[in-house]
Amino acid sequence: MWQLNENQVYLPPPTPVATIVSTDEYVQRTSLYYHAGSARLLTIGHPYFELKKPNGDISVPKVSGHQYRVFRVRLPDPNKFGLSDTSLFNSETQRLVWACVGVEVGRGQPLGVGVSGHPYFNKDEDVENSSAYGTGPGQDSRENVAMDYKQTQLCMLGCTPPIGEYWGKGTPCNASRVTLGDCPVLELKTEVIQDGDMVDTGFGAMDFASLQANKSDVPLDLCTSISKYPDYLGMAAEPYGNSLFFFLRREQMFVRHFFNRAGTTGDSVPTDLYITGTSGRTPIAGSIYYSTPSGSLVTSDSQIFNKPLWIQKAQGHNNGICFGNQLFVTVVDTTRSTNLTLCAATQSPTPTPYNNSNFKEYLRHGEEFDLQFIFQLCVITLNAEVMTYIHAMDPTLLEDWNFKIAPPASASLEDTYRFLTNKAIACQRDAPPKVREDPYKKYKFWDVNLTERFSSQLDQFPLGRKFLMQAGVRAGPRFKSRKRPAPSSSSSSKPVTPKRKKTKR
C-alpha cells in the first residue's frame, strides 16, 4: 500500500537574502570635520508627579532625576551645504551624509542624592530585625516611608530611537477562567524609550499601573508609571545597527531595609516547608518579602559625563553614520537627583511666633545639559547595488535624496476614459500626493535643533580643541606678525668699497 511521505520539504526563499554589511563598505570619509553644539538645556518640574489645572492642562511637568532624557538631535542636510570645494562629490551620482566621530554630554548642577517615597507605603513589618512575631496587618497598616534609589549613569547614541523592555500584563490562554484576585500573567514587552520614561530604580522594570492595583507597593513617582530597562540584547541584534552605535553604563545598588507586604498572601507557603507553630506563632506571617534599594555614595571619581567620547568603531554595522540627518542621545544620571525644597509664607509680614501652618512647602527638581558633537563629512556613491541595499534598510532615505525606485510593470488591464470632464463618470483627477509624516510623531523626545550651529573652526570650541589635540593637528596662526623682519648680516654691515687695482705705468 502506498503512503504519502510525511516529511516536510523546505524550499529556498524566492529571492536571495541580502547580506548586511558595514557602512564602511559603501561610505567614503572625507577630511572635513565640523563642530556642532547645543545651547544650555534646562528643565524643571515636580519630582514625583505632574500638576494639572482644573481643565486638565499640565501646569508643572514631572521632572525627576530618575527619568530618561532622550534628545532628538536634528542635523542640517549636508547636500544643501555651500561647500568651497565643488569637486568633493558628484551631485548626479553621489550624496553626502554625516558621521558622528565625537560626542560630549555635559552635566551641570552639583552631585546629590534624591529621595522618593509614599505617604501610604505598603510596609507591614521590619523582617530584618523584628522584635516580635507578626500578629497580622489589620485593616490598613500602610506607613509613610522614603528611600533613595539605585544609582545609574547611562549614555546611548544611535540614529533611531532606543528600545526598552519591561514586564507587562499579558493575555491568558483562557480568559474565561480568570477570576478577581488571580495573579496577572506576565509578558516581556519592548517599546521605544521616550523622554520622561522612568528608569529602573531597584524595584524592577515593569508596568506598575497594571500590575500593582493598590498603588502602594512603590513610591509616588512609580506607582502609576512604567519603568523601562534598555533592551541591550535586542538593540545589539538589530541587523543594521542604527539604534545603538555604542553605550556607556554604570549601575550600582545595595539593599538598605527588608520588609514584607501587608495583604492576603496569594501563593500560600506549602505546609511541607515548615512545622506548624504553637500559640503566638499562628497564623503564619506574610511571606511576600522585599527590600528597599539604595544607590550609596555619589562621587566625582565615578562620573561618565563631562568627558569626550570618540567613536572609532561602533558595535553594530552602522559605524556612526547619521541616516536621516538626526541623532538620538539617551541620558540617565541619578547622581544629580537632588530635590529642591521651596518654602513660601502665607502671610506678610511673617507672623511670630513660628507656626507650621503659616508656611507652604514645595518640591522641585531641575536638570542642566549640554551636548557637543564632532561630525565628519562622508560621501555615498549611489550605484544600483548600494541603492537597493539602502532601499531595503529605509526607503525614505532615497526619497530624501530625490531618488525613487520604479515600481514593477503592471500586467493587469487598466481603465482609461475618453472624456475626463464628463459629468457622467467619476472624477478622474489624480489624488493629491500624500504628505510624508514623521515616523516618530507619536513619541515624545527632547528636540535639539543643530541645523544652524555647525562650524568648521574646530579650535574655537572646547570639544573641537580636544579633537585636534588627540588627532595630532595644530591650528595655524590667525594673525600675521606686524614686526619688520630682522635685517640680514650682509645688509646690517657697512658697505664695502672695492679697492682700486694698481696698474703699472
Swiss-Prot record:
Segments for region (Disordered): 474-505
Gene Ontology terms describing biological process: endocytosis involved in viral entry into host cell; virion attachment to host cell
Record InterPro entries: Capsid_L1_Papillomavir, Capsid_L1_sf_Papillomavir, dsDNA_vir_gr_I_capsid
Principal localisation: virion
GO molecular function: structural molecule activity
Pfam family, one: Late_protein_L1
Top-rank taxon: Viruses
Keywords: Capsid protein, Disulfide bond, Host nucleus, Host-virus interaction, Late protein, T=7 icosahedral capsid protein, Viral attachment to host cell, Viral penetration into host cytoplasm, Virion, Virus endocytosis by host, Virus entry into host cell
Gene3D superfamilies from the UniProt entry: Major capsid L1 (late) superfamily, Papillomavirus
Localization (cell): Virion; Host nucleus
SUPFAM superfamilies according to UniProt: Group I dsDNA viruses
Gene Ontology CC terms: host cell nucleus; T=7 icosahedral viral capsid
Ranges annotated as biased composition (Low complexity): 486-496
Subunit structure: Self-assembles into homopentamers. The capsid has an icosahedral symmetry and consists of 72 capsomers, with each capsomer being a pentamer of L1. Interacts with the minor capsid protein L2; this interaction is necessary for viral genome encapsidation. Interacts with protein E2; this interaction enhances E2-dependent replication and transcription activation.
Function: Forms an icosahedral capsid with a T=7 symmetry and a 50 nm diameter. The capsid is composed of 72 pentamers linked to each other by disulfide bonds and associated with L2 proteins. Binds to heparan sulfate proteoglycans on cell surface of basal layer keratinocytes to provide initial virion attachment. This binding mediates a conformational change in the virus capsid that facilitates efficient infection. The virion enters the host cell via endocytosis. During virus trafficking, L1 protein dissociates from the viral DNA and the genomic DNA is released to the host nucleus.
Record-stated family: Belongs to the papillomaviridae L1 protein family.
The protein's name: Major capsid protein L1
Annotated organism of origin: Human papillomavirus 40
